[in-house]
Swiss-Prot record:
Enzyme nomenclature, EC number: 3.1.4.17
Subunit description: Homodimer.
Protein name: cGMP-dependent 3',5'-cyclic phosphodiesterase
Domain of life (superkingdom): Eukaryota
Organism: Bos taurus (Bovine)
Lineage, top ranks: Eukaryota, Metazoa, Chordata, Craniata, Vertebrata
Region (Disordered): 1-21, 177-198
Residues annotated as catalytic: H636 (proton donor)
Binding site for 3',5'-cyclic GMP: S411, D426, I445, Y468, T479
Length: 921
């Protein structure tokens, strides 16, 4: 067995222990493999290495290819079995463990001790060593040993890799011996220092390469590069050398080691331009004179010194025949230029070391992937601890994505119907919806990724047609490169998009970053889906809590109640009041006990009961249940709901709505009017959010907190036994009715009205088109709002007296806000509110524009607008009077006493039972 000189072995013993090896056993094993130069030495080294790193090793057989392409073991001489588990491992080219080999698999006595079954704590490992360059199994090792731990598994992988490298080295030396021996015998060169034991002479360069190869046992690519570069510097007399590694996509060069120094951060630069890129394509060496100025600038920046001479030689993989690195030597000592001999030295070096280099780099890449997988598992742990809050989860996703990819900025968009919405940024979570970023789901880079579901890696953002640089121009930020990837749920549907901007330690995001982003996106999708599911579960609990709260507050409708209501049948509308269908009628004049019958009368007069075959007892129970569903705040009570419903009836009777809307739409509008303020607590949306109420927890993320609660309560009543008036509807009609009710009730939020006001104006200008579905939706919203504010269309006495009720409600909320330590709005503060000015402002900016639109669409509604304008004049006179005399006292409601009443300009005298519709939700 031939080994390297003792001096070399002493050098090896000083090398640091590879990370993860635990002790010197693995290092000694790799040293043994790194120093062999013949077959006998290889077999002995393999046996010693496996015995050192594996438990309870009893037998090791190493099978190598002979001249007839058979796998043969020399000690004792026998051929590898061709059947059973051995054949299975060779065909699959993967290591296989078993509890012994079958008797029919074993050719004679040498392998008899491996026959199954073995002792329970032992096994036979069949280890095929695959030469990827040749595409075939180069050797097979049979080992009888104990069961492996994780550390022993790791050590075995290292031994396998270095055994294959040692085998290739031995084979290369054998080929060289066969070609060099005759020539060396006849004409021994002067520099040859022959080892005549085998009849072969080696040059000094051969011996140096052999010594270098023996030293290349490192599992760390940087340590390996240091040894190779030191050898090149010595042999070429270069002041420093480096190895520029080519990325898998041939678009990027990276350097980690320069001369005798390992850089703290890897340096990367693009390979798309300049002569260095040509070297990768042409596989031909170049010198300094061939470089472009851009190449020179990049190299000098990397080296930190002036380049006076350079030799760049491509390193070609024998497995793929592709350039995997560029070996560069700089500034030859003595100021000379590099020669052809220097180029030959570099090529000769990598002829023997390129396989070790590429395999070590591949091994290190696997280790890096292992570390990244561990990092991803930690990321998953971090993400799954924030499932209770989607916003916090998205913030965590942004942080982890930025850290994993070394990106400067990260943004996450969630897909919301046809829009991509971002409300979580690097700086934190945006609470105000007005500051959210919303972009169409089919526009821009994020939109493209959301639409295609494919990752998009953009090296140069400004050169990409989908990039909009207006934001950069306005902010001064410079977007260099972008990596945008989709986030999908378990059904592979895109639910969001993540966008990474500006790679920090590289020219752009690499293929490795793409793979990492793809893996990361899986965790994102799972965590977001589970977070949304968690949110739904919480919402279900909140709904359950609210339902229980409502059932405790309200009593169910008894059979006696609806039987009494229907005892004499449904009363005709004309029997209620001769002016019941007139805009001048004040519904609050009707006693509250008679309002349920009035609802039934209006439904019958509009023919909905007959058209939709509604069961009268069910309808009676529904009406009584809705009435009980209202609490008793000063304004948002059942009488308000009845007044709103009555105004809907007036619109139907006076404006001929059947020429504009479908019957189902009108029916949905009327029922929505009845239910639009169910379970109102006398406080608005802002108060719910500020007080962190159960309602806010349930609905604040969607907006319109109270309106969504009103609709939910309406559904709860419909789902109550004996109250579903839509029970006979088809599935399609039932779904449409609920959709209409939801949209109409949500339209009672004045914020919604203000959002669609321009669309309403445009519709009034161009004229209503019954064939236009959007016009139907807009008109329903306008009609609902006009019904909700209908108290403003009644006489001055009604409007004046009603203001007392609504401001009592407002001031009660203001008192609660003060008790919470908050500052209420002026209109809610009994000590600051100047009611005449507040009413004038409300009528000018909200009420009058609404009824003006109604007049434009329905000329018969002109009297409504005129009456609202008249009431506005009354408030102006009241305001002027108090400007002269001052407020009567500190109580802002005192001015409503009869002493300060202004005579009714239109002479209308209406019974007082209600309030103005300043709905501040």
């Amino acid at each position: 067995m031939r080994r390297q000189p003792a001096a070399s072995r002493d050098l090896f013993a000083q090398e640091p222990v590879p990370p993860g090896s635990g002790d010197g056993a693995l290092q000694d094993a790799l040293l043994s493999l790194g120093s062999v130069i013949d077959v006998a030495g290889l077999q002995q080294a393999v046996k010693e290495a496996l015995s050192a790193v594996l438990p309870k090793v009893e037998t090791v057989y190493t099978y190598l290819l002979d001249g007839e392409s058979r796998l043969v073991c020399e000690e004792p001489p026998h051929e590898l079995p061709q059947e059973g588990k051995v054949r299975e491992a060779v065909i699959s080219r993967k290591r296989l463990g078993c509890n012994g080999l079958g008797p029919s698999d074993l050719p004679g006595k040498p392998l008899a001790r491996l026959v199954a079954p073995l002792a329970p704590d032992t096994q036979v490992l069949v280890i095929p060593l695959v030469d990827k360059e040749a595409g075939a199994v180069a050797a097979v090792i049979l080992v009888h040993c104990g069961q492996l731990s994780d550390n022993e598994e790791w050590s075995l992988q290292a031994v396998e890799k270095h055994t294959l490298v040692a085998l290739k080295r031995v084979q290369a030396l054998q080929q060289r011996e066969s070609s060099v021996a005759p020539e060396a015998t006849q004409n021994p060169p002067e520099e040859a220092a022959g080892d005549q034991k085998g009849g072969v002479a080696y040059t000094n360069q051969d011996r140096k390469i052999l010594q270098l190869c023996g030293e290349l046992y490192d599992l760390d690519a940087s340590s390996l590069q240091l040894k190779v570069l030191q050898y090149l510097q010595q042999e070429t007399q270069a002041s420093r050398c480096c190895l520029l590694l080519v990325s898998e996509d041939n678009l990027q060069l990276s350097c980690k080691v320069i001369g005798d120094k390992v850089l703290e951060e890897e340096i990367s630069f693009p390979l798309t331009t300049g002569r260095l890129g040509q070297v990768v394509e042409d596989k031909k060496s170049i010198q300094l004179k061939d470089l472009t100025s851009e190449d020179m600038q990049q190299l000098q920046s990397m080296l930190g010194c002036e380049v006076q001479a350079m030799l760049c030689v491509p390193v070609i993989s024998r497995a793929t025949d592709q350039v995997v690195a560029l070996a560069c030597a700089f500034n030859k000592l003595g100021g000379d230029l590099f020669t052809d001999q220097d180029e030959h030295v570099i090529q000769h070096c990598f002829h023997y070391t390129s396989t070790v280099l590429t395999s070590t780099l591949a091994f290190q890449k696997e280790q890096k992937l292992k570390c990244e997988c561990q990092a991803l598992l930690q990321v998953a742990k971090n993400l799954f601890t924030h499932l209770d809050d989607v916003s916090v989860l998205l913030q965590e996703i942004i942080t982890e994505a930025r850290n994993l990819s070394n990106a400067e900025i990260c943004s996450v968009f969630l897909l919301d119907q046809n829009e991509l919405v971002a409300k979580v940024f690097d700086g934190g979570v945006v609470e105000d919806e007005s500051y959210e970023i919303r972009i169409p789901a089919d526009q821009g880079i994020a939109g493209h990724v959301a639409t295609t579901g494919q990752i998009l890696n953009i090296p140069d953002a400004y050169a990409h047609p989908l990039f909009y640089r207006g934001v950069d121009d306005s902010t001064g930020f410079r977007t260099r490169n972008i990596l945008c990837f989709p986030i999908k749920n378990e059904n592979q549907e895109v639910i969001g998009v993540a966008e990474l901007v500006n790679k920090i330690n590289g020219p752009w995001f690499s293929k490795f970053d793409e793979d990492l982003a793809t893996a990361f996106s899986i965790y994102c999708g799972i965590s977001i889906a589970h977070s949304l599911l968690y949110k739904k579960v919480n919402e279900a609990q909140y709904r359950s809590h609210l339902a229980n709260e409502m059932m405790m507050y309200h009593m169910k409708v008894s059979d006696d109640e609806y039987t009494k209501l229907l005892h004499d049948g449904i009363q005709p509308v004309a029997a209620i009041d001769s002016n019941f269908a007139s805009f001048t009628y004040t519904p609050r004049s009707l006693p509250e006990d008679d309002t349920s019958m009035a609802i039934l009368s209006m439904l019958q007069d509009m023919n909905f009961i007959n058209n939709y075959k509604i069961d009268c007892p069910t309808l009676a129970r529904f009406c009584l249940m809705v009435k009980k569903g209202y609490r008793d705040p000063p304004y948002h009570n059942w009488m308000h709901a009845f007044s709103v419903s009555h105004f809907c009836y007036l619109l139907y009777k006076n404006l001929e709505l059947t020429n504009y809307l479908e019957d189902m739409e009108i029916f949905a509008l009327f029922i929505s009017c009845m239910c639009h303020d169910l379970d109102h607590r006398g406080t608005n949306n802002s108060f719910q959010v500020a007080s962190k109420s159960v309602l806010a927890a349930l609905y604040s993320s969607e907006g319109s907190v109270m309106e969504r609660h009103h609709f939910a309560q309406a559904i709860a009543i419909l789902n109550t036994h004996g109250c579903n008036i839509f029970d006979h509807f088809s599935r399609k009609d039932y779904q449409r009715m609920l959709d209409l009710m939801r949209d109409i009730i949500l339209a009672t939020d004045l914020a919604h009205h203000l959002r669609i006001f321009k669309d309403l104006q445009k519709m009034a200008e161009v004229g209503y088109d019954r064939t236009n579905k959007q016009h139907h939706s807009l008109l329903l919203c306008l009609l609902m709002t006009s019904c909700d504010l209908s108290d403003q269309t009644k006489g001055w006495k009604t409007t004046r007296k009603i203001a007392e009720l609504i401001y009592k409600e407002f001031f009660s909320q203001g008192d609660l806000e003060k008790a919470m330590g908050n500052r209420p709005m002026e209109m809610m503060d009994r000590e600051k509110a100047y009611i005449p000015e507040l009413q004038i402002s409300f009528m000018e900016h909200i009420a009058m524009p609404i009824y003006k639109l109604l007049q434009d669409l329905f000329p018969k509604a002109a009297e409504l607008y005129e009456r609202v304008a008249s009431n506005r004049e009354h408030w102006t006179k009241v305001s002027h009077k108090f400007t002269i005399r001052g407020l009567p006292s500190n109580n802002s409601l005192d001015f409503l006493d009869e002493e300060y009443e202004v005579p009714d300009l239109d002479g209308a005298r209406a019974p007082i039972n209600g309030c103005c519709s300043l709905d501040a939700e």
